[in-house]
């Protein structure tokens, strides 16, 4: 009996840490987009969540970024910090979206209603049911959470939707 429990526990841990996946590529792409919507725009209305997902899709369609959703979401090249308040202890992994570099489990979806909404919006955006409301933005930031990034001076602001400022 203990061997069965050990086996089930091992399989559960492998699934939890995404060591292997039974999802097809389309499902995986939708899930990556949903995770990004949840972590980047959890407190936003649907319009803000759609806008954040539009940026990911705009990046996928750009020659300057990877060509699939998961690669865009987990792309590394922006710095993050262990202590986000004092901006000390930089982490050498650079992240496009800060939640992908947070030193905590990033799949803890404690706000179930927002997670459900993020999944629904992700699927609809993936299927092309929502037009781009950001005017082609490939970047955004929330000034309540971070200082104005250096790249904002070099890009054109397209919209302010919810708490996020969008640029291309």
Regions found by a protein language model. Give the residues of each.
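Classical Sec-dependent N-terminal signal peptides that target proteins to the secretory pathway
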Residues: 2-23
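Bacterial extracytoplasmic/cell-wall-associated proteins, especially those involved in peptidoglycan
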Residues: 24-168
């Amino acid at each position: 009996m203990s061997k069965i429990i050990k086996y089930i526990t091992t399989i559960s841990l492998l699934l939890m840490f995404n060591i292997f996946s039974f999802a097809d590529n389309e499902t995986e792409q939708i899930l990556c987009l949903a995770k990004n919507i949840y972590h980047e725009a959890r407190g936003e209305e649907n319009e803000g969540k759609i806008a954040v997902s539009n940026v990911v899709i705009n990046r996928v369609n750009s020659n300057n970024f990877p060509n699939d959703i998961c690669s865009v979401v987990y792309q590394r090249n922006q710095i993050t910090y262990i202590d986000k308040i004092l901006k000390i202890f930089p982490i050498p992994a650079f992240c496009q979206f800060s939640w992908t570099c947070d030193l905590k489990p990033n799949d803890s979806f404690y706000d179930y209603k927002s997670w459900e909404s993020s999944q629904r919006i992700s699927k609809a955006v993936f299927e092309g049911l929502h037009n781009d409301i950001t005017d082609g933005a490939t970047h955004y930031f929330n000034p309540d959470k971070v200082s104005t990034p250096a790249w904002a001076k070099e890009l054109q602001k397209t919209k302010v939707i919810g708490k996020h400022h969008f640029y291309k």
